[in-house]
Amino acid sequence: MSSEHDTPGEALRLSSTDIRILGSLIEKQATSPETYPLTLNALVIACNQKTSREPVMNLTQGQVGQSLRALEARGFTRLVMGSRADRWEQRLDKALELVPAQLILCGLMFLRGPQTVNELLTRSGRMHDFEDSEQVLHQLERLIARGLALHIPRQAGQREDRYTHALGDPADIEAILAARSNPVERSAGGAVSVERIEELEARIAALEERLAQLEG
């Protein structure tokens, strides 16, 4: 690929920890506005969730804190001073001039990597009201045009194309693409259970958020 929009500039390169932090902040801003911005402890818990995260990570407060400060210096996060605890919020939407729909799609791709349009539509249900898959695709195409997302043509054995963000380290992105080149496709019978899986993940995420509130 040779287009000037194929990849973002060096200023937008993000580490895997940066990506997880931003994705978690975007998610919690949309799903748990009553506890957002997040304390450092709550953010670490969000980053290390066992559900709705691919891959699952085990970040420490030190790692998250260091990345937050680096992201703040680049205008992607902001520390909000509080009387009881300091909290963190994402500023990616303002830094990159993203509309809400684009921010949510970026957040989902940050947290779960390459996904189909239908997966993004289903998983965004708690965060943004897309009318249909065409709206999702339209916003993905706008992100691709700006070099912020990538289109992954369907591979042998796959039924649909996939989309992922383009803000990570090039080596990490190549590894993701390689790992996804021959995935085990869900069977037709298993497709019915996707919504059930998403429902269970949402319930577990809600419990983890309550735990974060108690500990934060």
Swiss-Prot record:
| PANTHER family from the UniProt entry | UPF0502 PROTEIN YCEH
Q: Which family does it belong to?
A: Belongs to the UPF0502 family.
Q: Which organism is it from?
A: Pseudomonas fluorescens (strain ATCC BAA-477 / NRRL B-23932 / Pf-5)
Q: What's the name of the protein?
A: UPF0502 protein PFL_4004
